[in-house]
Amino acid sequence: MAEEKKLKLSNTVLPSESMKVVAESMGIAQIQEETCQLLTDEVSYRIKEIAQDALKFMHMGKRQKLTTSDIDYALKLKNVEPLYGFHAQEFIPFRFASGGGRELYFYEEKEVDLSDIINTPLPRVPLDVCLKAHWLSIEGCQPAIPENPPPAPKEQQKAEATEPLKSAKPGQEEDGPLKGKGQGATTADGKGKEKKAPPLLEGAPLRLKPRSIHELSVEQQLYYKEITEACVGSCEAKRAEALQSIATDPGLYQMLPRFSTFISEGVRVNVVQNNLALLIYLMRMVKALMDNPTLYLEKYVHELIPAVMTCIVSRQLCLRPDVDNHWALRDFAARLVAQICKHFSTTTNNIQSRITKTFTKSWVDEKTPWTTRYGSIAGLAELGHDVIKTLILPRLQQEGERIRSVLDGPVLSNIDRIGADHVQSLLLKHCAPVLAKLRPPPDNQDAYRAEFGSLGPLLCSQVVKARAQAALQAQQVNRTTLTITQPRPTLTLSQAPQPGPRTPGLLKVPGSIALPVQTLVSARAAAPPQPSPPPTKFIVMSSSSSAPSTQQVLSLSTSAPGSGSTTTSPVTTTVPSVQPIVKLVSTATTAPPSTAPSGPGSVQKYIVVSLPPTGEGKGGPTSHPSPVPPPASSPSPLSGSALCGGKQEAGDSPPPAPGTPKANGSQPNSGSPQPAP
């Protein structure tokens, strides 16, 4: 029994050949047999020890099967790093097989059908590995590119520019809590009395916000150089690209001080030199900076506002004021000032009130030249209707007398005459819309002359034009549109008188032609109900021949009720070679059908006809077109479209003669159709 137990124990020792294989894998070629035997015994002992400890963990876990976690715990118990990567949710499905005195454990694999593998579609080719580099930082400055975090938003820039400086409390770091006791802390002395701690800000030094140093990288300096040279250069294409870059680039926050200084100094130098072109370019740069949604210019308006106002009220901006158009620069700069006031004026800085005071002071001064007077009025007018109502309208009479004395008096200077004329046009342009809203109609020239002096009649005419334009715009916005479509009609028409009778022709409309749209607009209100002739029937014709246009004579017939006589009025029209579509557009008030059964707008028919080429469509059978549905509203007499060639009002043409066929193709009772006289 002892020998059998010995033999059984000896089977658990690892073979020495395994030690040789491990040694050869490590680069040790020659190893003695005794060394291999000693290593084998040591490794076998360590494995048995770990297995015994793992069994202890298994028994403590009240489990019947040994797991890899038990082996890991045993290794940790021996201060040995555990093995990684051998964990599985289920037990490894090894199968046991024995035969020929040998025991074998193997992994059972599924049988795979080769046809399934062949018919399986190939997987998609994976993308190649590619590397893309971008600048994380350039000399300490982070470029504004999509790969990097976005720069400071506009709201943060506004907060930094408008928030007052805050003093830090002593004993408190920038982001840390108080080191000492708080303001509400109390201390008790030996007598039990409580004493309040001294206030924290008492005698504490103020920590001011450090000055920010705008250091530009080499790339930013190069960008600044290229942008400024392009903005004031002679190439308009480069200037447009540079202004577009300024208006859209999100990474210009660090360059704002340079741009504002460049604009301010550029205006100061070029005003002295009377360089109008460069002043215009600099104002366009200001406009581009203000259009950039990522920039907040609050900290730089103290440099931009004087530069822009200089271009408005400066006495002379160009070398030849009587020839050069410096008035456009003043208007553009005035709009820029209004935009600055709209965006940055608050109750704290009072930008708009200060600018208004400056403009008013220069305008009221009697010695102010006409160029400065023009700029002051333009700047005030661009600030809104309230400023015009409060500051400009009360001084129109005095300004009108000043303008009249220059325009009607002796010629002293051509520059003054041109300036007075521009000031007069500017006042009429900006004051007329305000007066149209303030004063109720009708507009009387005598009343305007009494209130506004010599400018009264001109203002009255401008107000009348403003009212008409506003009414026309409201009419175009509120108009009702009705589009009429119908199938292919066939229509018999009587042509112009020719020698000998003519048989009526059959006219067809092709269906596969690009159709232009014709719009008929009615702007007259519905007339009161009264007896009137039947409604006029308009005929719009187009030719399908290859000729560019064709002239046709159409008979528009009307008849008076009870007269028994009809009159035909020929109308010559020039029509294009494509079929039109008629759109009925009306803004007139529709009268109820019961109140005006026979009015001019009760029934209207609009017929669209296309003529085939010469020699076609003759001798065909006569058929009547399906009636066109009347429009939703009853429009008054319509203004003719481009095809009708004029205006035709209901009841204006004489009644048709007896026996004349009607325009819609219906035949009279007297017999065959007769040619129109």
From Swiss-Prot:
Location of Phosphotyrosine modifications: Y253
Keywords: Apoptosis, Disease variant, Intellectual disability, Isopeptide bond, Methylation, Nucleus, Phosphoprotein, Transcription, Transcription regulation, Ubl conjugation
Ranges of compositional bias, category Pro residues: 624-634
Ranges where the record places region Disordered: 142-204, 524-574, 611-677
Gene Ontology molecular function: any one: transcription coactivator activity
CDD domains in the record: HFD_TAF6 (cd22931), TAF6C (cd08050)
PTM sites of type Phosphothreonine: T120, T248, T660
Keyword Transcription regulation: yes
PANTHER family: TRANSCRIPTION INITIATION FACTOR TFIID SUBUNIT 6
Function comment: The TFIID basal transcription factor complex plays a major role in the initiation of RNA polymerase II (Pol II)-dependent transcription. TFIID recognizes and binds promoters with or without a TATA box via its subunit TBP, a TATA-box-binding protein, and promotes assembly of the pre-initiation complex (PIC). The TFIID complex consists of TBP and TBP-associated factors (TAFs), including TAF1, TAF2, TAF3, TAF4, TAF5, TAF6, TAF7, TAF8, TAF9, TAF10, TAF11, TAF12 and TAF13. The TFIID complex structure can be divided into 3 modules TFIID-A, TFIID-B, and TFIID-C.
Record protein name field: Transcription initiation factor TFIID subunit 6
Taxon lineage: Eukaryota, Metazoa, Chordata, Craniata, Vertebrata
